[in-house]
């Protein structure tokens, strides 16, 4: 079951980020100290605040704390991108995801399971969306491998798509 405050998949619970929740603040602070935080975004605090505001406009963009076995393990961002034209191509509505898992839970194959489960769930929740996008830098081999194992395919540039089946 999923609500506006949380999304539940087989293995994970995604709770909407609460700026007053000390557990949520702690996960954010751990990620900010982690050297690969720039993979998530350069200014985590601003990104979280802006994403929570965007949710009021589109109802899809949001920031979530990821829970696995009742333990907070990271942060997920969902960003809605409406139909747009880029370089002469019309791109349909899409949801882009970005996630960061704290070091303690990395290298346990949670990333690929998490990406697969949240992508399937988002496509169930939003039937007009055809695919989920993950943007992964070329040098981030672990994340690219996790995305492929989760069912993503390479699209172009640094974009990988999880298509509706």
What are the roles of these predicted feature ranges?
Residues 1-50:
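A short, well-structured alpha-helix characteristic of acyl/acetyltransferase catalytic modules
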Residues 9, 67-69, 164-165:
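Active-site beta-strand termini and strand-to-loop segments that position acidic
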Residues 121, 132-144:
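Conserved beta-strand-loop-alpha-helix junction that forms the acyl-donor binding cleft
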Residues 101, 107-122, 144-149:
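Conserved acetyl-CoA-binding loop-helix of GNAT-fold acetyltransferases
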Residues 96-108, 136-137:
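A short, internal acetyl-CoA/4′-phosphopantetheine-binding micro-motif in the GNAT/acyltransferase core
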Residues 83, 133-135, 148-165:
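Conserved catalytic-core motifs of GNAT/GCN5-like acyltransferases
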Residues 61, 127-129:
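Short, high-confidence coil segments that cap the C-terminus of an alpha-helix
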Residues 41-98:
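Acetyl-CoA-dependent GNAT
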């Amino acid at each position: 079951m999923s609500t506006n405050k949380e999304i539940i998949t087989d293995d994970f619970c995604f709770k909407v980020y609460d700026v007053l929740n000390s557990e949520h603040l702690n996960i954010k602070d751990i990620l900010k100290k982690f050297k690969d935080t720039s993979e998530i975004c350069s200014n985590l605090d601003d990104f979280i605040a802006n994403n929570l505001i965007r949710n009021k406009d589109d109802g899809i963009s949001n920031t979530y704390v990821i829970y696995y076995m009742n333990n907070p393990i990271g942060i997920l961002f969902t960003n809605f991108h409406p139909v747009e034209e880029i370089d002469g191509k019309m791109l349909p509505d899409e949801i882009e995801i970005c996630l960061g898992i704290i070091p303690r839970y990395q290298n346990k194959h949670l990333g690929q399971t998490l990406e697969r489960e949240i992508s399937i769930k988002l496509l169930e929740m939003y039937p007009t969306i055809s695919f989920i996008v993950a943007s992964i830098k070329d040098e981030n081999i672990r994340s690219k491998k996790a995305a492929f194992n989760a069912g993503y395919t390479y699209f172009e540039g640094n974009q990988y798509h999880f298509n509706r089946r």
